[in-house]
Amino acid sequence: MAKHCQGAAAEDISAVSDEELLRWSKEELIKRLRKVDNEKMSLMLEHGNMMKDVNRRLQLHLHEIRGLKDVNQKLQDESQELRELCCFLDDDRQKGKKLSREWQRFGRHSATVVWKEVGTYQQKLKELEAKQESLVRDNLELKEIILMLDEERNGPGSRSSIDSQNSLTNLNGGSGPRDVGDGSSTSSTGSAGSPDHHHHHHHIKTTENKAGTIRKSTDDLSVPPHHRSIPNGLNDSSTTYIRQLETRVKLLEDDNKLLSQHSTSGELRTLRKGLSPYHSESQLSSLPQYQEPLQNGSARVAPEVSSTAPAGYIPVVQKPEAVVHAMKVLEVHENLDRQIPDTYEEDLSEKEKAIVREMCNVVWRKLGDAANSKPSIRQHLSGNQFKGPL
């Protein structure tokens, strides 16, 4: 509005010509001049206010600019941190990519090696399965053989008793018929008409079979351990079964030895009745120097001894344990013949007689087996120093 008044006054003055101004009076000119001065002062005040307003706005804008600068600086700092973090993450990504490539190569190589090893192990597994099948077949065959041998040993018509009787028959074929009651090893343990034949026939056959089994097992066990070789292909179960059989045979042999010792020490009358004097004192007096038992129950013949030994006796290293026991039994028998009166013969029962005869059968079967396996013992027995029952 002031601008409008000032413009209107300027237009009024500028529109007035000089002639008209000269015509005006002093009072009118002073009024016009003061009016113009007032208008100028108002315009100046208005301009000052406007400048203050502008300055205030400028200050506000400056404060805003400073705040924006601070925000911008913070954003720049954050941007720098993010840039550095991006660089770090990019490095990690590169490392991870490189590591993943290496792991891929390692995985492919490992898979190849594993497949090769699996193929090799599958081949070995097939071979082991084939070997296991062959071992199972061999074990079954060996078990059948062992069972057959065990049945043959424990059977009533075992080969051991037959062989022992045949060997004794061949050795003593020239001897005359023996008396029935003298403890001879006949198959019927006496004649068919003897009074104790029918009473003890079944018991004596069972005892003979057991004695034949013990004799056969003793011959098998008398071989040194390095001569007994286990076949290749026997597994632990078969070996354990064989060892159990050997242990059982040893126990039976020990029982037989204990029975013999008990009969020798506690039943002297039975021994006297069961054995007959086939040997003179002169023959038995030359035997004790050779009656030393062996350590392992087996005969080891040295080349020098076997080549230079006379035919009339058996060296110590050649005498089996059965021969030694038989000599001891015969010596006890001779002593009984000299010491015990004949009145004790009446005290023996039929059962005691059968037991004594069976013990004699066992002893002479062992002598026959030893003579069949050792030529020197066969020669010694054929020299009429020991004549067992047929």
Swiss-Prot record:
**GO CC aspect terms:** adherens junction; apical junction complex; bicellular tight junction
> Which intervals of the chain are annotated as region Disordered?
153-237
Q: In terms of one coarse class, where is the protein primarily found?
A: other
Q: List where this protein forms a coiled coil.
A: 26-86, 116-146
**Keywords, in A-Z order:** Cell junction, Coiled coil, Developmental protein, Tight junction
Compartments, as annotated in UniProt? Cell junction, Tight junction; Cell junction, Adherens junction
Bias regions of kind Low complexity — which residues? 182-194
Q: Which InterPro entries match?
A: CCDC85 (IPR019359)
Q: Describe the task this protein carries out.
A: May play a role in cell-cell adhesion and epithelium development. May play an important role in cortical development, especially in the maintenance of radial glia.
Question: What family does the database annotate?
Answer: Belongs to the CCDC85 family.
Protein name in UniProt: Coiled-coil domain-containing protein 85C
From which organism does this entry originate?
Xenopus laevis (African clawed frog)
